[in-house]
Amino acid sequence: MQDLAKPKIKIKSPAKINLHLEVIGKREDGFHELAMIMQNIDLSDYLEFEINNEGLIKLESDCNDLSLSDDNLIVKSANLLRKNSNINYGANIFLRKNIPIGAGLAGGSSNAAATLIGLNKLWNLDLDHGTLCSLASTLGSDIPFFINGGIQLCFGRGEILEKLDSNFEYGVILLKNPNVSVSTAETYKKYSNRFCDNHLNDRKMIENIRKNLRDNGLNKLNFDNQHLFIKNDLQLVVENENDSVKQALYLLSKLENCLTFSMSGSGPTCFALFKDIETAKKELTANSKFFKDKGYDSWVCTFLEKGITFI
């Protein structure tokens, strides 16, 4: 095996929020048909990659709550890329974790996509964008979004992407109770039991919903007389069963300059939007102690035009 040079590659791996999450129905393959708008935000993890010639994937992290073994999406992504490319190189990977775990912000999916992108460069594989997206879709439904990044329409399981052209500069405040997490699989199951009686087979309805989101999705997110529309079907389930989510949404709704508020993904993180990052920072400065006293961690961030980036 030929030795490669040992550069160190560093990558910024951002979180996402859902600006629209519509569950159209349950498919015959067991997955749910979705129509979503996902947006990267600048709450980010950081990954470092370095070649090792032992043929091993070695993952370390500053987060003690993460498994670092083969069930970690970073390790799965690295092993998939090695197998697909038929190479024997390994990698030493270090993850600096800032995105909370089990929060509805898809930190694990972002890290998986960052690993595919980072190791593609580190190992000089030169795989094209389409190949990386195909590999990503085998690992998780929302991982292809992070290969693309920015703001995207997401259809199917979340793997069918259409780039949106926007220049939103909203500020974001996030709230999450650090002692609460939500199972995405359980949330979808509960939603399906309540609202999806039969398997979905109406292709015309699916296409109509997709067209409506293409035509009107961005309009609903434009600031107009302090009214924005954000839809999250899963919030119907989680808010009723999780007091911390219900309270977080209430607290965000009472912020003076809040334009709108919602839960992200399957929760439990909730967020509020503000006209710009300066307004969001002022609101968080004024309320951070109050949020902490209520049991919430809080963050302020803004939208990103791009997703995963080399640094």
UniProtKB/Swiss-Prot annotation:
Entry keyword annotation includes DNA-binding: no
Enzyme class: transferase
InterPro entries attached to this UniProt entry: GHMP_kinase_C_dom, GHMP_kinase_C_sf, GHMP_kinase_N_dom, IspE, Ribosomal_Su5_D2-typ_SF, Ribsml_uS5_D2-typ_fold_subgr
Catalysis: reaction(s): 4-CDP-2-C-methyl-D-erythritol + ATP = 4-CDP-2-C-methyl-D-erythritol 2-phosphate + ADP + H(+)
Signal sequence bounds: none
Keywords from the named record: ATP-binding, Isoprene biosynthesis, Kinase, Nucleotide-binding, Transferase
Keyword Transit peptide: no
Active site feature: 16, 142
Known pathway: Isoprenoid biosynthesis; isopentenyl diphosphate biosynthesis via DXP pathway; isopentenyl diphosphate from 1-deoxy-D-xylulose 5-phosphate: step 3/6
Biological process, per Gene Ontology: isopentenyl diphosphate biosynthetic process, methylerythritol 4-phosphate pathway; terpenoid biosynthetic process
Pfam entry (one): GHMP_kinases_C
Gene Ontology terms, MF aspect: 4-(cytidine 5'-diphospho)-2-C-methyl-D-erythritol kinase activity; ATP binding
Binding site for ATP: 100-110
EC number: 2.7.1.148
Recorded family membership: Belongs to the GHMP kinase family. IspE subfamily.
Function: Catalyzes the phosphorylation of the position 2 hydroxy group of 4-diphosphocytidyl-2C-methyl-D-erythritol.
Protein name: 4-diphosphocytidyl-2-C-methyl-D-erythritol kinase
Natural source organism: Prochlorococcus marinus (strain MIT 9301)
Source organism phylogeny: Bacteria, Bacillati, Cyanobacteriota, Cyanophyceae, Synechococcales
Gene symbol of the encoding locus: ispE
